[in-house]
C-alpha cells in the first residue's frame, strides 16, 4: 500500500548515480571506446572530469565540454547504453515503482545527464516524459555526438539552480541526489530537504 502524502510536495531526483547506480556518460564512454587501445585511459579521464564537475572543483560547463570531446560516441552506442542502464536502476527506485507512478505529477528528474538515455529508462518506471529535465546531445549527419545543446540551462554552470528557480515550485521540495549540483538546490533555498 502506498502511503498518502500529507501535503503537496515535489521530489527532484538526480539520474546518474542516484536513479541509476552508475554515471551514464562514463558508461557511454566505456561502450563507445570498447575497441580503442587507449580506452581505459580515456574512460578514466572522463570519470575524473565527472567527479571534478560534481564536486564543484571545476566549472560544470567546462567538465561537460571536455567529456563530450573525449567520447567519440554515436546513436548506436546510445542504444546499447539504454539497455545497460535499464539493468542498473537503483534498487530503491525499482522497489518504489508504485509510488513513482502514483505521484508521477510530483516527481521530477533534474539531471545534467542526457535525455537521450534518461527518458527511456525513467519512463519505464512511471516518470512522466514532460517531468524529465536534462541536457540533449547535438549530432552530425552520421549520428555521431558532436556536442551538447548549449542553450539548455542544464549545460551551464549553476544550471539546476537556474532551472528549479524558474519553475517556482510552491510546495515542499525534497531533493534526492549525490552531487554538489544537487546540494546547491538546498543551499540556495530551493529545497526543503536534501
Q: Where would I find each of the regions flagged by the language model?
A:
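Alpha-helical substrate-recognition element adjacent to the catalytic core
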Residues: 2-136
